[in-house]
């Protein structure tokens, strides 16, 4: 089998560069910002992203989880609306709907979501 490094180079699995790139660097502190840190969390402390990741270790990975993780790594923020975390995929979908349907269409989609969410309770 072969691996593709971050710089695009294709190398064998037993290449020493593969082992060094797959191990996280020691002492690295994850980047924290206002968007991905919960209210009341210290600036260097674990935010909801790390807590959610720890809670989902046993959960099956979906394509949306993978896409969210890649978008967060690229710098798209996760923000909070009340006590709900809004993932980057959801933010991009909302922007796309806003462009395609306008404000009225976006409000209609929000109303349909709200009614369906409240009817499940």
From Swiss-Prot:
Q: Which InterPro entries match?
A: DUF4605 (IPR027953), FAM241_domain (IPR052502)
Instruction: Keywords in alphabetical order, please.
Output: Membrane, Phosphoprotein, Transmembrane, Transmembrane helix
User: What membrane topology does this protein have?
Assistant: Single-pass membrane protein
Composition-biased stretches (Polar residues): 19-35
Cite the residue spans of the region called Disordered.
12-58
Kindly list the positions at which Phosphoserine occurs in this protein: 33, 62
Please list every transmembrane segment annotated in the UniProt record, as residue ranges: 92-112
What is stated as this protein's family in its record? Belongs to the FAM241 family.
Purpose = May play a role in lysosome homeostasis.
From the Swiss-Prot or TrEMBL record, give the protein name.
Protein FAM241B
What species does this protein belong to?
Homo sapiens (Human)
Q: Which gene encodes it?
A: FAM241B
């Amino acid at each position: 089998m072969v691996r593709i490094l971050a710089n695009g180079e294709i190398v064998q699995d037993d290449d020493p560069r593969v082992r060094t790139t797959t191990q996280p660097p020691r002492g690295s502190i994850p980047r924290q910002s206002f968007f991905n840190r919960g209210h009341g969390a210290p600036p260097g402390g674990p935010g909801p992203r790390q807590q959610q990741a720890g809670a989902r270790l046993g959960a099956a990975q979906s394509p949306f989880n993978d896409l969210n993780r890649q978008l967060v790594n690229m710098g798209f923020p996760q923000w909070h609306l009340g006590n709900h975390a809004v993932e980057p995929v959801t933010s991009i979908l909302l922007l796309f709907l806003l462009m395609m349907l306008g404000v009225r269409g976006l409000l209609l989609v929000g109303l349909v979501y709200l009614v369906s969410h409240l009817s499940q309770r």
